[in-house]
Amino acid sequence: MSDEDYALFEAHPQATIGGCIKIEVFESKQTGLRGMLVQTDEPLCSLHVVLATEADTNDWSHKDDGLPHTLEHAIFLGSELYPFKGILDKLANRSLADGTNAWTATDHTCYTLTTAGEEGCLNLLPIYADHILYPTLTDSCFH
């Protein structure tokens, strides 16, 4: 990240795993969004975007209606800037990725991407983020 990018985030204390794998945690000053950077000496670069989903059933909740799981699939149908079904996987394949993937658990949904080298992940991150934050969500998504 550039110095300008770092100015948008607050760095938290670093940690290490096994004395050799450094973990850096950053938090957006504007949104509170947290990101972790784990650097390893491997040829693959993995991206995991994890969003909290409703885990409680109460008077105002959706009572297990499957909405988080439906949205998990719907984001792959396009976004505001990239309104094309399957464009993420097509672009990911250009970065020697095995496509994109996601899963929904009780309390979170995780979107993943693994590419050969960091350049692919960095190039796809804004496109993936647009799909996650601004999906097109047309009626056809729910039929």
Where are the regions that the model predicts?
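His/Glu-rich zincin catalytic helix
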Residues: 1-88, 112, 126
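Active-site-adjacent, His/Asp/Glu-enriched structural segments that form or flank metal-binding
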Residues: 64, 73-143
